[in-house]
Amino acid sequence: MRRNYILYIIRYTFTIAFAMTLTACNEWLELMPDDSTIEEEFWQNGNQVESVVRACYRYMQEDNVMQRIILWGELRSDEVQNGSAISVSETDIVNANVKSNNTYCNWASFYTVINYCNNVLEKAPGVRQLDANFDEATFKAYMAEAYTLRALCYFYLLRTFRDVPLVLESSKSDDYDYNVSNRDTAAWVAYYQLPVSAASFTSQQYPLVDQEHYVVDKMIDDLKTAVEYAAKEWNDEENYGRITRRAAEALLADFYLWRASINQQLAPQQSTTDYRNCMAMCDAVLAETSEMEDAELVTGANLLRQVFYDGNSTESIFELNFTTSGHQNGGTSTLYGNTQKSRNPHLLAAVSLQMLFNQNKAGNDDADYDYRSKDFFNPRDNHIFKYEGQTPPSDFGSRNATYTYRGSSSQANWIFYRLADIYLMKAEALAQIASTAAEIEDVVTLCNKTYIRACTSSDEVKDQLDPNVYASTSDVQTLVLTERQRELMFEGKRWFDLLRLARRNGDVTTSWQYIESRYDDDVTTIRNKMSSIAAWYLPIYNNEMKINGNLRQNEYYESQDD
């Protein structure tokens, strides 16, 4: 029986990771010759379940995962330009010359994390029956971590490749067939309980049933369970580095926002419901945050230092903790560069970013008092400072002063969700359904949460986005997209924001207007290549296509490798 290449890698790395994880816990798992022996002797108590949960986080810290998280969300966006160390593979993606043999089309590392999660979800219930000390609350918390991390991995895969195989079982043995389809009609019929057979299914009859919706809907179901099961908080050291209820709610809000956008053209009423679902999840996060001691937005003056240099700040919800694990964050240091680590950047901040801080319709020059305009990147040489930076110039008048990077042994956490993102997700959802002047003003108020805190003075009349000049739904929709870029630049979100906009509109015209500034040459050629929404996704890796006959290539790339 043919075996999928990616899942051969999964099984191998899973066994090795077990050994590494347990060694750290002063235990040792002897590498047995077959999977059944390992399963029989390993899954005996709650501590062993936790060790595999921790392996999920640990593998997400690998460069193969981290660099894709950043590149998939930033490389083609309008907020970066090519740096001196950019690779040929990265340049090909930027220039819309991507082929299916491009290394960044390899999704294996994400399915490795998914496999760890699948093992937890399969085996933890049995361990609960074996170990009397493995209490129900702890068991559910571990399950919530696995559900949420698996959903997070699928969220990146969905937004990068669109149609991806949904693997919900762990690799068990050489005899297990993992040639899973990414157009699994039989699975759709079963999941949605459709009154048709797989053979008679047609997309014309069920326009909201396809692989993308199937994976999105399943992950939303899982995240609802995760919200119910998740720990409200861990101890202080782990409260931001492990999945909590707030983290599950934040990811669920993001999924609702995505589903609302992909449904907007075909099912506007369902789309409206999901925008409201997104807002409800954001409200849940904010309500729980209000009950926590010292959980709040960091001041603008401390934003770079506390949120991105120190990490685990008062506005954090979930971040991968490199600072406590001792593992190197090869994503930010390699791609954004760091002089203290002798790393030249693959990516620089786009020159056009300075214009973001000159768009306050009240007539103020935002760049003169918005901390983000000098702390997130160096406006002199366009080096990205967020994450790898330690100390920016102390005031706006000294922008030619030295930017000090974190030292060679200092590692940046990677932030998936923080309070700023919650306010802006809620703002985006509300902007899509706002029908009254009061609701439109509420969108501006939400954007002002991040805008006002980033300004230097306490004069909120001056340092605010004026609701009087954002009078229409179109105005506030554009405002949200702009404020998300000002606040969340270089956090792996911008490309997905623009793709979400394209899916919402049903075409790429408006989204292309943002990224057109990314190109100096061959603009017409690249625009033509990017004219289809399918071209905004990446092709499935060629090795996967060769080994798994059940995979179908993204339609845009079916003839690209000929």
Each PLM stretch: what is its role?
Residues 40, 66-87, 167-170, 176-177, ...:
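Short, surface-exposed recognition loops and adjoining beta-strand edges that mediate ligand/DNA contacts
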Residues 158-160, 165, 234, 258-268, ...:
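Short coil/turn linking the two alpha-helices of tandem helical-hairpin repeats
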Residues 23-24:
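C-terminal motif of bacterial Sec signal peptides marking the signal peptidase cleavage site
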